[in-house]
Amino acid sequence: MTATKQTAQVTAVADGTVVTPKGFQAAGVHAGLRYSKKDLGVILCDVPASAAAVYTQSHFQAAPLKVTQASLAVEQKLQAVIVNSACANACTGEQGLKDAYEMRELCAKQFGLALHHVAVASTGVIGEYLPMEKIRAGIKQLVPGVTMADAEAFQTAILTTDTVMKRACYQTTVDGKTVTVGGAAKGSGMIHPNMATMLAFITTDANISSAVLHDALRSITDVSFNQITVDGDTSTNDMVVVMASGLAGNDELTPNHPDWEHFYEALRKTCEDLAKQIARDGEGATKLIEVRVRGAKTDEEAKKIAKQIVGSNLVKTAVYGADANWGRIIGAIGYSDAEVNPDNVDVAIGPIVMLKGSEPQPFSEEEATAYLQQETVVIEVDLHLGDGFGVAWGCDLTYDYVKINASYRT
């Protein structure tokens, strides 16, 4: 399920949030799980919304994800997502599962919802139990609203080592109606999704069934959240949840709808925007790295090589040091299990071609260094084997990454 090559009519909403689509409210409070910052949030929908989710592939899937899957299994509808930071509630056994179910029950009771219309998410330190006394009191403090302040309170409540809030919003037209997609995400370390290592909450007022929404989300996740890496670690907790209120008033969307491409592109842009923000905010990062691979046998192989390059610690440290060592890029391509012709590969860093037909090209070290000092570094590779294309995003690897993770619990 993919968008066509035509340019879809999609517009970015600069100040848009998860409450910009019709029918959504949000809130965030300080419940005491963290020292002073907000740590408990909720997104609430006015009606039971069509819903879809994708989850971490970690064997140690955390308790909140199991509860969310149980909720969605009933009728694929959600009306609220309750989220805490500071404690992952992962590897916490039966007690952890019991606590996650209690979070769902408390949220449902607070807002008068059916139990199975509530999703639960947690992020933070693994192997610690939720302080349920604080969760119980905190949920009672949640008063959702539709203002920017309400959305930002939620966005702040879901952060861990993030340095900035991540939000995105796009609008399009379906059946002459304005359809909006808004999103909020967290993620800075343990970023190597499959689907994993981050949380994203996406809202839309599109009229769409849960089944069609799920297919679209799966397809888009593969070219957005699953194509980012910060440190190669996969989390126990993370997921993407999408809720669609249907309040835009359009005819129900399917891939056969004449405006399907518009909605699909708005959802894709929202996910890609959030994914790139997560990569840019990698722990200790100073630069966003974008790797574009073309000429692969298939799109899958192109995506695989792009992610291999952007995940290479040697490439990441070279970018941090503004060192145009293209041999590290070749090294990353070389240990990929995708098909490669080693006698015909092109490599460029930004506008500077460094390898053409697997032959080194003369280039100015000064120009290359100047380019690598920019906040966004683009690496392009052409394999000359087919039409496969893929993009991946990551960040440089700095001294601060070690400092942050050496003292994460202190």
Curated annotation (Swiss-Prot):
The record marks T123, G124 as: Involved in the stabilization of negative charge on the oxyanion by the formation of the oxyanion hole. Signal peptide: none annotated. It catalyses: N(2)-acetyl-L-ornithine + L-glutamate = N-acetyl-L-glutamate + L-ornithine; L-glutamate + acetyl-CoA = N-acetyl-L-glutamate + CoA + H(+). It is found in: Cytoplasm. GO terms for molecular function: glutamate N-acetyltransferase activity; L-glutamate N-acetyltransferase activity. The keyword Metal-binding does not apply. Heterotetramer of two alpha and two beta chains. Catalyzes two activities which are involved in the cyclic version of arginine biosynthesis: the synthesis of N-acetylglutamate from glutamate and acetyl-CoA as the acetyl donor, and of ornithine by transacetylation between N(2)-acetylornithine and glutamate. This is Arginine biosynthesis bifunctional protein ArgJ. It comes from Geobacillus kaustophilus (strain HTA426). The lineage of its organism: Bacteria, Bacillati, Bacillota, Bacilli, Bacillales.
